[in-house]
């Protein structure tokens, strides 16, 4: 059944915007159904909020799912201290604008030991500041379900993960031990200490995300749009060179290029792409002819063969 809303900023009958096409409407309905199912089945759900485009769509869908009430669970942001400055500013703007309950967590051990992408390398840094930090935050909040914005088209290990992804008491995932999911029937039974990661965007593609952002006029971090920015080329990636903590290596030169980001994370580990796409129409047109995954710009996915699956088995997003 379609999910409609009274006249609000989320749904305005007087709007001149065309209605969602049937494909996007079906994806929206599925996602809203998943949000409501998890909220009804679990005692302490939480939504992982990484501030990127998928999180922005996830937040919009959550607001739709529970209108006219507030979102009935907090948002959790694992703050490594190395996100793009524009991401943190955007996060704070969204929290204030929509009166969100945000929990931000930084791994105290990592902060005390000054763990950084530069000093510890991407693999160890990600394990301590992201995976370990996420497990800490989930334990501290005693959350039994966590919404995430992962999509199956992103990466091989995510392609085989169910919408309800079951985790052991220490948050580990076993891809060989997944439950069947028949149509829209989800089995949320868990033992004490276990939890579920739920992925309402599982069946969306990157282009679906952008078309929905355009159709619903969803705010996103400006870094997704092309403009001239300072960059340095390192390990085959274009790294944004705005943060004073980025020290140039011998032979490196900072220069201005017209770039944008297809994916956002910690700035030292996230590569930009050369692009002139500075509007939503341009971004969608660019992606329709893209031949590589958006995660090609993530250094953490290059650590070793199967690195993402290894991280997910250990409790990563």
From Swiss-Prot:
Known EC number: 2.7.7.4
Annotated keywords: ATP-binding, Nucleotide-binding, Nucleotidyltransferase, Transferase
Family in the record: Belongs to the PAPS reductase family. CysD subfamily.
Residue spans of biased composition, Basic and acidic residues class: 1-10
Biological role: With CysN forms the ATP sulfurylase (ATPS) that catalyzes the adenylation of sulfate producing adenosine 5'-phosphosulfate (APS) and diphosphate, the first enzymatic step in sulfur assimilation pathway. APS synthesis involves the formation of a high-energy phosphoric-sulfuric acid anhydride bond driven by GTP hydrolysis by CysN coupled to ATP hydrolysis by CysD.
Gene (UniProt): cysD
Presence of the UniProt keyword rRNA-binding in the record: no
Subunit annotation: Heterodimer composed of CysD, the smaller subunit, and CysN.
Pathway(s) where this gene product acts: Sulfur metabolism; hydrogen sulfide biosynthesis; sulfite from sulfate: step 1/3
InterPro entries reported for this sequence: PAPS_reduct_dom, Rossmann-like_a/b/a_fold, SO4_adenylTrfase_ssu, Sulfate_adenylyltrnsfr_sub2
Domain of life, source organism: Bacteria
Catalytic activity of the protein: sulfate + ATP + H(+) = adenosine 5'-phosphosulfate + diphosphate
Enzyme class: transferase
Protein name: Sulfate adenylyltransferase subunit 2
Annotated region (Disordered), positions in chain: 1-21, 295-317
Molecular function via GO: ATP binding; sulfate adenylyltransferase (ATP) activity
BP GO annotations: hydrogen sulfide biosynthetic process; sulfate assimilation
Name of a matching Pfam family: PAPS_reduct
């Amino acid at each position: 059944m379609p999910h409609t809303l009274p006249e609000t900023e989320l749904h305005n009958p007087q709007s001149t915007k065309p209605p969602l096409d049937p494909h996007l409407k079906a994806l929206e309905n599925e996602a809203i159904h998943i949000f409501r199912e998890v909220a009804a089945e679990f005692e302490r759900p939480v939504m992982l909020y990484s501030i990127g485009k998928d999180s922005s769509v996830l937040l919009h869908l959550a607001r739709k799912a529970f209108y006219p009430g507030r979102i009935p669970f907090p948002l959790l942001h694992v703050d490594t201290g190395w996100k793009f400055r524009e991401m943190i500013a955007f996060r704070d703007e969204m929290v204030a604008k929509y009166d969100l309950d945000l929990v931000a967590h930084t791994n105290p051990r990592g902060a005390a030991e000054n763990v950084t992408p530069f000093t510890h390398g991407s693999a160890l840094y990600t394990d301590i500041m992201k995976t370990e930090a996420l497990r800490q935050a989930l334990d501290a909040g005693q959350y039994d379900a966590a919404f995430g914005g992962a999509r199956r088209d992103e990466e091989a290990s995510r392609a085989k993960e169910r919408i309800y992804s079951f985790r052991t008491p220490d948050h580990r995932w076993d891809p060989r031990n997944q439950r069947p999911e028949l149509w829209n029937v989800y089995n949320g039974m868990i033992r004490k200490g276990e939890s579920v990661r739920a992925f309402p965007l599982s069946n969306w593609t990157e282009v679906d995300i952008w078309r929905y952002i355009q159709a619903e006029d969803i705010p996103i971090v400006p870094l997704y749009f092309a403009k001239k920015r300072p960059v340095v080329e390192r390990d085959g990636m274009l790294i944004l060179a705005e943060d004073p903590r980025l020290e140039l290596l011998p032979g490196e030169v900072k220069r201005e290029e017209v770039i944008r980001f297809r994916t956002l994370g910690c700035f030292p580990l996230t590569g930009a792409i050369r692009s002139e796409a500075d509007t939503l129409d341009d971004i969608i047109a660019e992606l329709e002819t893209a031949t590589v995954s958006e995660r090609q710009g993530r250094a953490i996915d290059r650590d070793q063969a199967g690195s993402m699956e290894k991280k997910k088995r250990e409790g990563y997003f």
